[in-house]
Swiss-Prot record:
The record marks N13 as: Discriminates between blocked and unblocked aminoacyl-tRNA. Belongs to the PTH family. GO terms for cellular component: cytoplasm. Its EC number is 3.1.1.29. This is Peptidyl-tRNA hydrolase. TRNA binds at Y18, Y72, N74, N120. HAMAP family: Pept_tRNA_hydro_bact. Pfam families: Pept_tRNA_hydro (PF01195). Hydrolyzes ribosome-free peptidyl-tRNAs (with 1 or more amino acids incorporated), which drop off the ribosome during protein synthesis, or as a result of ribosome stalling. Catalyzes the release of premature peptidyl moieties from peptidyl-tRNA molecules trapped in stalled 50S ribosomal subunits, and thus maintains levels of free tRNAs and 50S ribosomes. GO terms for biological process: protein quality control for misfolded or incompletely synthesized proteins; rescue of stalled ribosome.
Amino acid sequence: MASDFWLIAGLGNPGSKYEGTRHNMGFMTADVLAERWSVNFSDHKGLAMLGKGVMNLSGRNVKFFLAKPLTYMNESGNAVASISAYYQIEPDHIVVIHDDMDLDFGRIKVKAGGSAGGHNGIKSIDRSLGTPKYARVRMGVGHAQRGAHAHDNTVNWVLGGFGPDQRKQLPEFLADGADAAETIIFDGLAKAQERFNGR
């Protein structure tokens, strides 16, 4: 029987050298949710830091798990699939938060299904769950310069940090990402898209 829990997974890379990098937008947004709903993380089978909480909005309570995979980005699916199988959480109750280079910094797009858009963490989750039909909160980090060394530029870009102006805007942006995940859970995907995608 499917669980009534939701699973929110914020993607990133573990370890201090990746803290505060563009690729760790998911981790940072998960930390905002953890603080907001008093979630404490502990180890899940060496695959993820996992916590459990209850959200209360508009007089409704929703139980959820909050995960930060420890597998490194490209194997994120191992962690998400393990947690969803262990706790019997269906894909339609999964929200994944991740960085997205196709969106300018500060923009958020909510979607379910569709292409992984070149994001290796999403490709891994699609593969491990056997479906792309889960909700995603795409957090814009802007684009590396194209050119002869496009791949290297991209890697350096996502593993780089934010400039001073962006750092100032980051707390509000992360709070918006957390709001987007909550809106999906409480009001549904279409409402979340209406609220966040047009900004």
